[in-house]
Amino acid sequence: MAKEKIRIRLKAYDHRILDQSAEKIVETAKRSGATVSGPIPLPTEKTVYTILRAVHKYKDSREQFEMRTHKRLIDIVSPTPQTVDSLMRLDLXSGVDIEIKL
């Protein structure tokens, strides 16, 4: 596993939980002897929903809701077998979506 790289993408609606999870992953990887680059903040995806406040008419009266998806990227450059094993056992908070590419 000398030339391989592990790329971890994290997504969450709450940036505080996302940063805590990223720090746990970086700390675990560094403790097992791997070289880590990140967490790199990626652009926040913002989705806006516009709805009418009234049921029947009054189109001028609208309300907008937004949903923000925060993203982080972590690259583990030289993972050891111990790194992969410790990352598999890592317990992260709920609400964080994790994509791992080897």
Curated annotation (Swiss-Prot):
<dbReference type="GO" id="GO:0005840">
    <property type="term" value="C:ribosome"/>
</dbReference>
<comment type="function">
    <text>Involved in the binding of tRNA to the ribosomes.</text>
</comment>
<dbReference type="Pfam" id="PF00338">
    <property type="entry name" value="Ribosomal_S10"/>
</dbReference>
<comment type="subunit">
    <text>Part of the 30S ribosomal subunit.</text>
</comment>
<dbReference type="InterPro" id="IPR018268">
    <property type="entry name" value="Ribosomal_uS10_CS"/>
</dbReference>
<protein>
    <recommendedName>
        <fullName>Small ribosomal subunit protein uS10</fullName>
    </recommendedName>
</protein>
<dbReference type="GO" id="GO:0006412">
    <property type="term" value="P:translation"/>
</dbReference>
<dbReference type="InterPro" id="IPR036838">
    <property type="entry name" value="Ribosomal_uS10_dom_sf"/>
</dbReference>
<comment type="similarity">
    <text>Belongs to the universal ribosomal protein uS10 family.</text>
</comment>
<dbReference type="GO" id="GO:0000049">
    <property type="term" value="F:tRNA binding"/>
</dbReference>
<dbReference type="GO" id="GO:1990904">
    <property type="term" value="C:ribonucleoprotein complex"/>
</dbReference>
<keyword id="KW-0689">Ribosomal protein</keyword>
<dbReference type="InterPro" id="IPR027486">
    <property type="entry name" value="Ribosomal_uS10_dom"/>
</dbReference>
<dbReference type="InterPro" id="IPR001848">
    <property type="entry name" value="Ribosomal_uS10"/>
</dbReference>
<keyword id="KW-0687">Ribonucleoprotein</keyword>
<dbReference type="GO" id="GO:0003735">
    <property type="term" value="F:structural constituent of ribosome"/>
</dbReference>
